[in-house]
Structure formats: structure tokens, C-alpha cells
Amino acid sequence: MPPEFKAELAERYVTCVSGEIAVSTVPELLEVTQSWVDGLSENCSDLTASVVEPEVDVEAPADVFITAPGQTPECNAIAASPVGIDAVAVSVSVEGLDGVLFTPELLHRALSGGMTSWADPELQELNPDIELSDTPVVVRAATRPQDAAALNEWMSRIDSAGWPAIPSGLVSDASFDIDTVITELETEGTIAIVPASLVTNNSLQTISIQTQPDIESTFVTVESVISAGTQMVATTSGSFVTAALDASLPPIPAAGNDVASLPWQALNQFTMTVCAGSNEEAGRAFARYALRLESQGAMTSFGFTEMHEQVRVAGVDAVSQGLPEPTIPPSGAPEEVPEEISTDVPTEEVTEEPSEEVTEEPLEEVTDEASPEPTS
């Protein structure tokens, strides 16, 4: 079955199997993961899912892991796919400096402790229309390693001379307490590398970047992060999908637009891994559910970014291997799959008996069990 068609089926029909699974997730995606667990449980009466917080339930086993860059799931993996994106932003705590323009070279100097005042002459030259104050620069040194790495990859790629390595003023710190970080950012003059979701959810000020001379500056926005996401290319090996940003590819304009937003290319991916074991089929069903387009909307709702369609479709195809294909129940449901998703695939692959006409009623999500389960 073509991956695109399988993704359409995953969107319209919830695949249900019997089982009981625990899903381990990173703290920042706790609410997103809980929404997926709740949605799957509501649709599948014989599948029970729960969320495990590894920092709290240290010894609790898990059947599915959702991890951040640099983290390795503690299991024998049988399938994996990117499941969402969080960009990396540079926050500034100086009134009136939202969007203040930096070059990679000046940002490197600031994060290395070489820019001591927000009235720096080079910064003023880059921002002639902003009245800068002589506020001391306070560098928040503690930075998550994945955030430093993502920003470093982007900055060094566009200006290797001005950004030769991770700035010396930063200290790798994997711990990240949101309340503590927010409190530290209240100090006037602070500059810090933080997740873009933190910026979005707390309305923080951020800098913009001049990626090339005489080119419009790039801001970290929903549109610019989505634009960068369209430059990601999926690679599939069996049930495993990885994705990497290819900066040589032109970003794809959003629907209804002729021109794509300038991409903000400091990105981190979250990866979803299904573990081998007695619950692996249920784990695959959860992964498939999380990669549905409707389910991906939870990422956006909580300040993150959903995977680009090309990567998402590849992920659905990979994690679905071995799962029963959704079929239409013999009663209480439309008799034929809508024309728009059955054009290239014979009807008998997705329906149990031929029909002479398409029902006039809207198609509801149904499960592949003998009788329809309510969906949400």
C-alpha cells in the first residue's frame, strides 16, 4: 500500500489492537503525550495506555519512548520516527528589544562574554532605529546540550569564521526547570538560549538573526520554524525513520502563500521509539495514532511544531508495519471509502464488500474492530 494512502487511512480510521502499554516521555511533552494517550484510549476499548515520567518513575518500564536529542531509549527498539519539533531561540530581557538584530559573529561575542553592554556600538550599528540603553549584559550560562548543539550547527554553517564553535560563556546543563528559567530571565539585561516553546508559551522577547548581508533578518516564529521543517528530508530503513535538515532545499511556502517564510534552522526533533516485547503491536498502534495529522495538532496547541508532511507520512508507514489495516465495519458505517482516498488503491483493500453508491452522510473515524468504536 502506498505510504500516502496509508497515512490517509491512519487519519480517517483509528487502528485498535488489544494490549496495555506505558509511554515514557520527556517533561516538556507530558501534556502532548497525555492527550495522545487519552485520545487512543477513548477510541480503543481494548487498549489501555498510560504515561510514565522517567524523572519521577525511575524504575517504571515503558513500551514506547518519546525522547529529546541525545537521549537513548532503554529498550530493544523495533520502530522509530520523528514525532515533533521544538526550535531553539535566543531570549533577551531588555525592554523594547524584541527582535533586536544580531549577526552570528556578534551573537557569539555576546554569549562568550565579550559584549558587556546593551549599548554596544556594533549592536547599535545593526539596529539604527532602536535606542539602546547602557544595561549590563547578563549571560545565562546554563544551556541544554541539544539547544547549544542546534544553534551551533546553524550559526557555524552560515558564518564559520564569526561562529567558530559553541561560545565559551555557555555551560552544558541537561536539567531544565521552567519556573527557575523564567525567574532568571526576569533579571534585566539577560540573554539566554532557550527552547522556542518556552518563548511561545510565556511571550518572551527574542533576537533576530542576519543570516546574510543585505538579506532580511530571520525571526523565530511559528511560520519560520514550519518553513525550516519543510527542508527536512526523511530517510527510512525498515521500521525506522530519521530526518535531517537539508539547507540546500528551498523551503516550501505555506498553503495559500506564494513565498515561504525565511527559515529559522535551529531545530530539535523529538523521536518516538516502539520497544520489542509482548506489547509491541499496541506500541505501534500508539505510534501510528500520534502521527495522525489530527494528533499532531496537539504539538502546535502546546507551543511546539508538528512534523512536515513528507516526514510524517514516512513515519506512519514505518511504524504501521505489522499492524492490521483499518477496515470498514459491516454495519453502522459508510459502505465505501471516499473517492479522494481510494483513487489509486482498489476499493477491496479498505472495504469488506462492494457497494453501489457512496453514503451521503459524513464519514466518521472508525476502528478496525468488528463494531464501531466512538472516536474523537
Language-model regions, residue ranges each:
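Flexible loop/hinge segments at secondary-structure junctions
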Residues: M1-P338
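Ser/Thr-rich, Proline-interspersed low-complexity disordered segments
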Residues: P2-P3, T327, S331, E335, ...
